[in-house]
Amino acid sequence: MPTKTSQHAFAGSERWVVPRYSSKPGTLIRLGSVLTDPEDLESSLNLDSIPPIPPHLLRDATPEVRMSVQTELSKSDSTLAKAAPALEGILTLGGGVEASRSQGVSSSLNISGTVKATVFRADKSYMDVLLKDKNVISYAKRGLGKPMFVVVGVATAGRVEMKETRHVTRKAGVSGKVGVEVIGEGEVGLERERSDKSCNEVRGEGGLDFAYRVREFGYSRVRGTVKDKGDWTGKVLFAGGKGPVVEKGGEVVPVFKEFKEGEVKLRATGSFDVAAKA
């Protein structure tokens, strides 16, 4: 499959994606892995058949990534330190009975120990080799303009700790009209509230891949070419860059979607920005 890719340099702003669960080095996050979903590392089309990357395309990104992580974790509103989604809804159950549920998850990510990072430049020659994979070819030709996401950066830390606290508050109110002598009809009500809270903590030591950088490519079936669309900057979990975030009371609050009734669901990934050097 011939390709035409825009030539991009190492310099510029980089978006690093942080998955909820870290993995052992080289298991899920691999340079050159082609993903169909940038938030799902298991969607790789070529995880076990990635072609070797020429040394001249590799670059050590440790200094800037390490500095970015240290800077973020030192701030009280760190994009890596917290995320607090919440979902509130009122359900009308009928018969004058109403119930409301407030549910959410607060999470924290702590990174310590030695931080290392490597990035590579997926130039035209490498993409030509990468796109010869039969699974990649099949996926690219399956649909019109389907995007592909290539892992072009991996960051590893000596110790990673993820802590999640889930909380659900339920309220139920029952109201009805009753007869009251002389005064006439009135209303009485009863409200009950119950709160449930659980905490889950996951730790990993001995070297873990905790972040990856993804570059998006679009394949044109008509022209038979692949276009480099730059770093993927889609949906994010943490504030700090482009993505579904809103300001509330002077604080940037993450926006979470795809909640299901009776379930609190966190997005699979977060992100942070790094200013790369040439």
UniProtKB/Swiss-Prot annotation:
Segment forming the signal sequence: none
Keywords per UniProt: Cell membrane, Membrane, Necrosis, Transmembrane, Transmembrane beta strand
GO cellular component: plasma membrane
Lineage top rank: taxon: Eukaryota
Site feature location: Cleavage: L237, F238
GO MF entries: wide pore channel activity
Keyword Cell membrane on entry: yes
The protein, known as: Gasdermin-like protein het-Q1
